[in-house]
Amino acid sequence: MNQGKIWTVVNPAIGIPALLGSVTVIAILVHLAILSHTTWFPAYWQGGVKKAA
């Protein structure tokens, strides 16, 4: 790890949850942005159009 000295400044009990939490928030924001600005993504989540028999 080339940034191993960061843990001498930031306690791992604070830094690791903060890092994982920020990654989670960014992922949720990206999904919401795609969901609200495209038409194909909501259709993809719905599984496509079903054909009537």
UniProtKB/Swiss-Prot annotation:
<keyword id="KW-0812">Transmembrane</keyword>
<dbReference type="GO" id="GO:0019684">
    <property type="term" value="P:photosynthesis, light reaction"/>
</dbReference>
<dbReference type="GO" id="GO:0045156">
    <property type="term" value="F:electron transporter, transferring electrons within the cyclic electron transport pathway of photosynthesis activity"/>
</dbReference>
<protein>
    <recommendedName>
        <fullName>Light-harvesting protein B-800/850 alpha chain</fullName>
    </recommendedName>
</protein>
<keyword id="KW-0460">Magnesium</keyword>
<dbReference type="InterPro" id="IPR035889">
    <property type="entry name" value="Light-harvesting_complex"/>
</dbReference>
<dbReference type="GO" id="GO:0005886">
    <property type="term" value="C:plasma membrane"/>
</dbReference>
<feature type="binding site" description="axial binding residue">
    <location>
        <position position="31"/>
    </location>
    <ligand>
        <name>a bacteriochlorophyll</name>
    </ligand>
</feature>
<keyword id="KW-0042">Antenna complex</keyword>
<keyword id="KW-1003">Cell membrane</keyword>
<dbReference type="InterPro" id="IPR002361">
    <property type="entry name" value="Antenna_alpha_CS"/>
</dbReference>
<feature type="topological domain" description="Cytoplasmic">
    <location>
        <begin position="1"/>
        <end position="13"/>
    </location>
</feature>
<dbReference type="Pfam" id="PF00556">
    <property type="entry name" value="LHC"/>
</dbReference>
<dbReference type="GO" id="GO:0030077">
    <property type="term" value="C:plasma membrane light-harvesting complex"/>
</dbReference>
<keyword id="KW-0997">Cell inner membrane</keyword>
<keyword id="KW-1133">Transmembrane helix</keyword>
<keyword id="KW-0437">Light-harvesting polypeptide</keyword>
<keyword id="KW-0157">Chromophore</keyword>
<comment type="subunit">
    <text>The core complex is formed by 9 alpha and 9 beta chains that bind bacteriochlorophyll and carotenoid molecules, and is disposed around the reaction center. The non-pigmented gamma chains may constitute additional components.</text>
</comment>
<keyword id="KW-0479">Metal-binding</keyword>
<dbReference type="GO" id="GO:0042314">
    <property type="term" value="F:bacteriochlorophyll binding"/>
</dbReference>
<feature type="transmembrane region" description="Helical">
    <location>
        <begin position="14"/>
        <end position="34"/>
    </location>
</feature>
<feature type="topological domain" description="Periplasmic">
    <location>
        <begin position="35"/>
        <end position="53"/>
    </location>
</feature>
<keyword id="KW-0472">Membrane</keyword>
<dbReference type="GO" id="GO:0046872">
    <property type="term" value="F:metal ion binding"/>
</dbReference>
<keyword id="KW-0148">Chlorophyll</keyword>
<dbReference type="GO" id="GO:0019866">
    <property type="term" value="C:organelle inner membrane"/>
</dbReference>
<dbReference type="InterPro" id="IPR000066">
    <property type="entry name" value="Antenna_a/b"/>
</dbReference>
<dbReference type="InterPro" id="IPR018332">
    <property type="entry name" value="Antenna_alpha"/>
</dbReference>
<keyword id="KW-0076">Bacteriochlorophyll</keyword>
<comment type="function">
    <text>Antenna complexes are light-harvesting systems, which transfer the excitation energy to the reaction centers.</text>
</comment>
